[in-house]
Amino acid sequence: MTPAHGTQPGMLPGHEFEALLGARHHDPFAVLGPHPDGDGTLVRACLPGAASVQLTDAGGTPLAEMARLHGGGVFAARLPREYKGGAPDYRLRVQWSDGSGQCGADPYAFGLLLGELDLHLIAEGRHFELGACLGAQWQRVDGIDGVRFAVWAPNARRVSVIADFNGWHPARHPMRLRHPSGIWELFIPAALGAQPGSRYKYDLLDPHGTELPDKADPLALATEAPPATASVVAGPGQGAPPFAWHDADWMARRGGADPYAAPMSVYEVHALSWLRAANDTQRGWEILAERLVPYVQELGFTHIELLPITEHPFGGSWGYQPLSLYAPTARLGPPQAFAAFIDRCHQAGIGVLLDWVPAHFPTDPHGLARFDGTALYEHEDPREGFHQDWNTLIYNLGRNEVRGFLLAGALHWLEHFHADGLRVDAVASMLYRDYSREPGQWVPNRFGGRENLEAIDFLRELNAVVHERCPGALTIAEESTAWPGVTASVASGGLGFDFKWNMGWMHDTLHYLGHEPVHRAWHHQDMTFGLVYAWSEAFVLPLSHDEVVHGKASMIGKVPGDEWQRFAGLRAYYGFMWAHPGKKLLFMGGELAQWQEWNHDAELDWALLDHPMHRGMHTLVRDLNRLYRELPALHALDHRPEGFQWVVGDDNHNSVFAWLRRAGPYSREVVLVVVNMTPVPRYGYRLGVPYAGAWQECLNTDAAVYGGTNVGNSGAVAAVDVPSHGQPASLALTLPPLATLVLRFDPGGGIQGAST
């Protein structure tokens, strides 16, 4: 179409029309909206698809009919009063060619939206409320309700909001660039269709003017459910204030707690496959609140750890390839439902940990990859920016805005959703520039080394900021190497995490468990080596999702032997783990002794609870958690060597292990743990203990209630003043086959007819 003939007010050169209607104008505010025109005001609007446009006052009284300057949909009118800036004092009444109509304030009549302090903090990577600054923010500007859109794309030639309220037309709502920050912004009034629930994306031209794939909002607070890829405008109460929280007591207690001395037993959950009924885009989180929370409460776990719930396009990634780091997945319901789930957990006395992925992101075209036509979030050089193992892109942590995007994203979950901690995924891949790379495939740091200095700085800053702003929130590293000081303080040169997954312990002990009992004598050190370094870091002992997939077998499937030996061996192993120094983590299904590996497309095999052996395993996990929480000796000194002492660590011939756990260096709160990893019962097995007197058998994994043979010590044993194993007293035990015993010293206990 061509410009209208004549000399209508507001006529533009032909190239301006072409730029506006072709969605290629780099500065739409220079020509659209109100502009001084002598003693009046000239108003232009670009509204492709409009049949007519009228200017009215705020009350709807007509002021002027806008003339069509171009057949493509550019209009202009002159108001007989001077424009002085500030709030728009007119409205656009649009009659669309399909017969519908709208009347609202002109998006191009509003002044600058983001303050200079906001822009400065974004550029410094220190805007910790980024989720309330960028993205789509429902708010009131100059007395008018609407949505403020803002996105970082410094190298784009043009950015437009495209949405269901503007026909996904890039010429309808081009944005304003704020130099030199690279932030594009636009306020679209609600009367023009921008509302909570609106679906939107960004349409960008790269630095050369080439159109890019439509992009989802990196700061979206809500999204469509995959496979759809649009972002969604989130309204008030959707996870951020003013959501009505009921967990003030929980948050206050959390802030004053000592996580190292407290019991911590984590139930790791993939929310989409724990129960298939929860795969409900409206009620998923509500269903989990109704079913998962009381289930975890009954089993006695202190925390739920959720595999990544940030929105991710590929369900088969289990959430570990996320794109919307500020939005909970829409597969389970809206953001406010996720907040309500966490609120319910806290009211039930259960903490919530979230797996969080700052190491890499997928290459989906609607995501962060070459967001503005350049390597914006990632490194340009694939030797730094491409992860060969996962076919993903690596965040450029040397860039302030990228670092700030991730830091604010972490705080978003902790502050606005009240999450109790973050388990940071794939830390080892972040720390080493040559991680999973051959010579020539990586770029050394500025000193010529393999350490990723930018990642080290980022992780230290992450932990410092989280601990400063979120009292009691935990950070946990999945770090699979021997990097020193992962849980040492930042001030002492460490990374500053609260805990680290003990991957070495997990690999060694599962390797031992997989051997036939007759061969375990030659692998005894697999069970004992973890105590050599147990206090070098603050550890979590993880039996995670990664250990029950990809041909590794389920937990019960790892154990050799007939069915009885498998169940007994796994019960003994769980007892060994719960009594071992370190916090605990068990992936869902482990409590059921599922035969099949985890399948993210199916739910847990709940029917197994109808079978006595599986029900027995379930009961054992409940009782292990109860005992672990009730006995300070099993958790109070997890992080200090004073809480542990070997009694027998070298009986490889019998595959027996025994140790003491203490609640304090001089405490008489003492527990004896004995593990027999062969199917042979041992009678009269003498062990040294620090005190003569009654020792109560608190737990026997061979008890009949768990599916065992009920071999044991009749509930108690009397220790006598016969030195053994460097201790002043000793007792003689019956060791059940493939079982763990936990005995507690009872200073006031008396035993009739007990064995000695």
Curated annotation (Swiss-Prot):
The active site is at D425 (nucleophile), E478 (proton donor). One of its GO terms (cellular component) is cytosol. Its EC number is 2.4.1.18. GO terms for biological process: glycogen biosynthetic process. InterPro entries: A-amylase/branching_C, Branching_enzy, GlgB, GlgB_N, GlgB_N_E_set_prok, Glyco_hydro_13_cat_dom, Glyco_hydro_13_N, Glyco_hydro_b. Keywords: Carbohydrate metabolism, Glycogen biosynthesis, Glycogen metabolism, Glycosyltransferase, Transferase. GO terms for molecular function: 1,4-alpha-glucan branching enzyme activity; cation binding; hydrolase activity, hydrolyzing O-glycosyl compounds. It catalyses: Transfers a segment of a (1->4)-alpha-D-glucan chain to a primary hydroxy group in a similar glucan chain. It comes from the Bacteria. Pfam families: Alpha-amylase, Alpha-amylase_C, CBM_48, GlgB_N. It is an enzyme of class 2 (transferase). Pathway: Glycan biosynthesis; glycogen biosynthesis. Monomer. Catalyzes the formation of the alpha-1,6-glucosidic linkages in glycogen by scission of a 1,4-alpha-linked oligosaccharide from growing alpha-1,4-glucan chains and the subsequent attachment of the oligosaccharide to the alpha-1,6 position. Belongs to the glycosyl hydrolase 13 family. GlgB subfamily. PANTHER family: 1,4-ALPHA-GLUCAN-BRANCHING ENZYME. This is 1,4-alpha-glucan branching enzyme GlgB. The gene is glgB.
